[in-house]
Swiss-Prot record:
Record's protein name: Vitamin D3 receptor
GO biological process, one term: intestinal absorption
Organism: Rattus norvegicus (Rat)
Region listing for Interaction with coactivator LXXLL motif, in residue ranges: 242-260
GO cellular component terms listed in the entry, alphabetical order: caveola; chromatin; dense fibrillar component; euchromatin; heterochromatin; nuclear matrix; nucleus; perinuclear region of cytoplasm
Compositional bias of kind Low complexity: 171-180
Keywords tagged on the record: Cytoplasm, DNA-binding, Metal-binding, Nucleus, Receptor, Transcription, Transcription regulation, Ubl conjugation, Zinc, Zinc-finger
Residues binding calcitriol, per UniProt: 143, 233, 270, 274, 301, 393
Region (Disordered): 159-180
Lipid metabolism is among the record's keywords: no
């Protein structure tokens, strides 16, 4: 043990490839690392240290050219020491007794400090780990990264009237009277165990010459397709929200209020997964479903919404959130006690506090610096940005839906969640 403590070891090249056997340069035994500037075993390291400290003078009883091996290294100390020097071992690397003691004390102090840091470092509780696991599962069940369901929407129509590789697919048509009770439709959507389609729409396999597939070449040609996309996304947000721990403890009225007020914000948050900063677009699997600023404008939105939306997407992307942080942020966004119309604000706040504490603890535990620097504050600022985007979206939506020719292209669920300006 004394020999070990007195050693000064250099970085060991053998650490880069542990499959390569390390051999002592003195006797050929298994080496344990670089000691006193050479690769040696523990035995030869200790022998060299003792010899140098004692200033020992050895004489070879033979011809001064003994071959040193693991088995005979004790037979000729002179040739063993000569071999140590020949391979580069240096007495300058040997610590004095005082230096050895200081080194031991430093090592002990460092271990104690690390143990203290570890004891003070926040850890995710079992409950917090459970919350994260539930939210991850909820997200995976309600977000399809293949975007396969987009093929069931009314086709995207760009300004040249093309629909890309569009071919006749099952088309979406309203069932019954679109002015029927949309509150019932919304409540039905909320109660669905796994919302996977439009509760208010029927899929039918009409032929391509059916009037319902007539391509819209109006200035708002992308409105039907993006209305279906938003309606689909609302269903998925509902499915995600229902799995948030504590959300089901709220009254149905509060659940609906929270979902109506946060739906577009969560859709914007979720869309960040498909957003690419290469060309500032949302890439949803194919060229047909790659959406840029022009596409959004052809659904009736202006630069007053689009520009801050793009800025928001870029800023959120640059945070490089872990998936765990992303799902927690979505849940916190939904469960906000300050939404207008919330009745049991205290219960909503308690649920949100639990989610917020989990997020803060996760960041401290799992998100290494420098990315974690003020990350929680930056994420909360993103929620504030979403409120502004929500307000502008509502303003533009009201203007859009006030026109019957546009309102009729929306789905009942969209009209219910965002409001129907047509009486």
């Amino acid at each position: 043990m004394e020999a070990t403590a007195a050693s000064t070891s250099l970085p060991d090249p053998g650490d880069f490839d542990r499959n390569v056997p390390r051999i002592c340069g003195v006797c050929g035994d298994r080496a344990t690392g670089f000691h006193f500037n050479a690769m040696t075993c523990e035995g030869c390291k200790g022998f060299f240290r003792r010899s140098m400290k004692r200033k020992a003078l050895f004489t070879c009883p033979f011809n001064g050219d003994c071959r040193i091996t693991k088995d005979n290294r004790r037979h000729c100390q002179a040739c063993r020491l000569k071999r140590c020097v020949d391979i580069g071992m240096m007495k300058e690397f040997i610590l004095t007794d005082e230096e050895v003691q200081r080194k031991r004390e430093m090592i002990m102090k460092r271990k104690e400090e690390e143990a203290l840091k570890d004891s003070l470092r926040p850890k995710l509780s079992e409950e917090q780990q459970h919350i994260i696991a539930i939210l991850l599962d909820a997200h995976h069940k309600t977000y399809d990264p293949t975007y396969a369901d987009f093929r069931d929407f009314r086709p995207p129509v760009r300004m040249d009237g093309s629909t890309g590789s569009y071919s006749p697919r099952p088309t979406l048509s309203f069932s019954g009277n679109s002015s029927s009770s949309s509150s019932d439709l919304y409540t039905t959507s909320l109660d669905m165990m796994e919302p996977s389609g439009f509760s208010n729409l029927d899929l039918n396999g009409e032929d391509s010459d059916d009037p319902s597939v007539t391509l819209d070449l109006s200035p708002l040609s992308m409105l039907p397709h993006l209305a279906d996309l938003v309606s689909y996304s609302i269903q998925k947000v509902i499915g995600f929200a229902k799995m948030i721990p504590g959300f089901r403890d709220l009254t149905s009225d509060d659940q609906i209020v929270l979902l109506k007020s946060s739906a577009i914000e969560v859709i914007m948050l979720r869309s960040n997964q498909s957003f690419t900063m290469d060309d500032m677009s949302w890439d949803c699997g194919s060229q047909d479903y790659k959406y840029d600023v022009t596409d959004v404008s052809k659904a009736g939105h202006t630069l007053e919404l689009i520009e801050p939306l793009i800025k928001f997407q870029v800023g959120l992307k640059k945070l490089n959130l872990h998936e765990e942080e992303h799902v927690l942020l979505m849940a916190i966004c939904i469960v906000s006690p300050d939404r207008p119309g919330v009745q049991d604000a205290k219960l909503v706040e308690a649920i949100q506090d639990r989610l917020s504490n989990t997020l803060q603890t996760y960041i401290r535990c799992r998100h290494p610096p420098p990315g974690s620097h003020q990350l929680y504050a930056k994420m909360i600022q993103k929620l504030a940005d979403l409120r502004s985007l929500n307000e502008e979206h509502s303003k533009q939506y009201r203007s859009l839906s006030f026109q019957p020719e546009n309102s009729m292209k929306l789905t009942p669920l969209v009209l219910e969640v965002f409001g129907n300006e047509i009486s």
